[in-house]
Amino acid sequence: MLRLLKRNIQISKRIVFTILKQKAFKGNHPCVPSVCTITYSRFHCLPDTLKSLLPMSSKTTLSMLPQVNIGANSFSAETPVDLKKENETELANISGPHKKSTSTSTRKRARSSKKKATDSVSDKIDESVASYDSSTHLRRSSRSKKPVNYNSSSESESEEQISKATKKVKQKEEEEYVEEVDEKSLKNESSSDEFEPVVPEQLETPISKRRRSRSSAKNLEKESTMNLDDHAPREMFDCLDKPIPWRGRLGYACLNTILRSMKERVFCSRTCRITTIQRDGLESVKQLGTQNVLDLIKLVEWNHNFGIHFMRVSSDLFPFASHAKYGYTLEFAQSHLEEVGKLANKYNHRLTMHPGQYTQIASPREVVVDSAIRDLAYHDEILSRMKLNEQLNKDAVLIIHLGGTFEGKKETLDRFRKNYQRLSDSVKARLVLENDDVSWSVQDLLPLCQELNIPLVLDWHHHNIVPGTLREGSLDLMPLIPTIRETWTRKGITQKQHYSESADPTAISGMKRRAHSDRVFDFPPCDPTMDLMIEAKEKEQAVFELCRRYELQNPPCPLEIMGPEYDQTRDGYYPPGAEKRLTARKRRSRKEEVEEDEK
C-alpha cells in the first residue's frame, strides 16, 4: 500500500545526499556536483520538511515549475539544475571557506565538521520520514491495482477522504449479487407453465436462487465444505427414472490412464514442435503419427477386452497435419488406419473426435476460419481412411463448440451460417455442435441446429454452468430432450451426450465449477439406449467406477477395481503396480503423504 510513499522518500533522500555527500570531485568543492538532476514532479510530492533541506537554488527553480499530478505518467519529465555556483556559498557554513589548508590538523577539523553537518542532515531526514503521515499520500485500493490519490492540503481533509474511500470499498465488497432465486418464487412461476419441473427433495446443491451478500456466500461455502464427506459425493440428478439398466455405450476421451502408466507407455498424443520439423524434417513427425496409430490399435483391443466400446480419438494423432505451412496428407498411415477400422467394425466400437477450442468457423478473423476449415478436413480424413461400416461411419462425428460471441451472438450466428457453406459434404455429414460452459447455451444452439440440420450434443455439466433461460440442474431441460434427439435421428446417427461433474461440488461461481472431477457418481436423466461420454480426469477408471456403483454389465466392472479380493492371476492388461491408479488421485496423494510422514 505504501510502496509509492517509500519510493518517494527514498528519492528525496537520494536528492539531498546527491548534493551533500557526493564524493566525486566536480567543481571547486568535493561535495558539490557540477550539475544535479532533480525530477520536478517528485519535488512537489515531497513533504515540506524535506523540501527545506534542499539548496535554495533547487527549491526556487523547481517551485517555479508547474506542479505535476501524481499518477501513471507523472515520473517522466526531468530537468537539470546547475547548482555549482549557488551551492558554493550555501555550503560555506558547512565546510568552511574554500581555501587550501596548509596544516594537517586544519584539514582534519574541516573533515570532521563536514561529517557532523552531513550526519545532522541525515538525522533531520530520518526524523522527517518518521514524522511523515502516510495518510496524506497515496494509498493502494484493495479492490484494484490502480492507486487512489487521497492527497489534500490539510490532514483533516485527507482523513475525511480516506474514511469516505474506505467506506466505498467496503460497500463494493458487500455489494449484493444474484446467487440464486428463491425456490418458492420459482415454484409459483413454474406453476403457470404446462411443464411442472420436479423439485428434488434431497438435492444438496440448491436449484433455488436468492440474493446473498458476498460475505454470506463465503460463509455458506465454508460451512458446506466443513460438512462435506469425501466418501459421500453429491448427487447431481435426483430424477425418478434413472437410465438403468444401461443398454447404451459408455466411453471415455483420448487417454487410457492404465496403459499410460505402463513401462512401455501406450498413448496416442505424441507431438513435437515446429523447430523439430525444421531440424529433422516431416519424416520425424510422420514417425510420431505412426506410433500414435499403432497405439490406437492397442487401445481399441484393450477397450474390447474390458467391455468398453466407445472412445474419443485424440486430435494430436498426427502432429501438425493441418498446419498451413508444414501440413501433410495421411497416405503413409493408410494401412494402420484401416487396421483400426477393422477392429472397430469387428467389435462395434464407436470412434469420435473433438477438434480443439481454436477450431472456430464463426470467428471474425479470416485466418482463424481458414485454419478451422483445414483442421476439420484433417479430422475427417482420419475417420474416412478407417473405412468404417455404414453405421459406425455415420456415428463417427466431429464435435465442435461455436466459440466466442465476438461482436454479438446474432452476428456470430450469421458468420457461422455463411462459413458453414464452405465446408465439404463429408465434413458437414460429421459436424456436431455442443453447448459450452462460457457463452452458448442449449437454447442458443438448438434453433441453429434445426435450421442447418446439425445434431446437438447435450453436455450436462456445461448446461449446469450456462443454463440459458432454463434453470440449472436438469429437469427443466426435459421438455427439450425429444427435440434434441430429433436432430440426431433425422440423420440416422446414434445420439450421444456428454456427462461430467464439478471437481468442487461446493463451488458457487461458474469459473470454479468448470473443472472436471476425477470420477463421476451419478447418471443424468437421459435415454438408456444412447451413448454417453464420461468426461472425467480418471478416464476409463471413471467409467468402471460408475459401473461399480450401479452394478452395470455394460461394461462389467473389472475384478481389479472391485476390491481387495480380486484374482491376481487373471490375465489382463493391468501392469504390476497399476492398482495404485485405480484409486482417486486426491485420496492416493493423501495416503502417500501419510506414509511418508510415518517413515
From Swiss-Prot:
This is UV-damage endonuclease. Belongs to the uve1/UvsE family. GO terms for biological process: base-excision repair; mismatch repair; mitochondrial DNA repair; nucleotide-excision repair; pyrimidine dimer repair; UV-damage excision repair. Gene3D superfamilies: Divalent-metal-dependent TIM barrel enzymes. NCBIfam families: uvde (TIGR00629). Induction: By UV light. Residues 97-115, 137-146 have a biased composition (Basic residues). Residues 116-127 have a biased composition (Basic and acidic residues). GO terms for molecular function: 5' deoxyribonuclease (pyrimidine dimer) activity; endonuclease activity; heteroduplex DNA loop binding. Residues 89-224, 561-599 are annotated as: Disordered. It comes from Schizosaccharomyces pombe (strain 972 / ATCC 24843). SUPFAM superfamilies: Xylose isomerase-like.
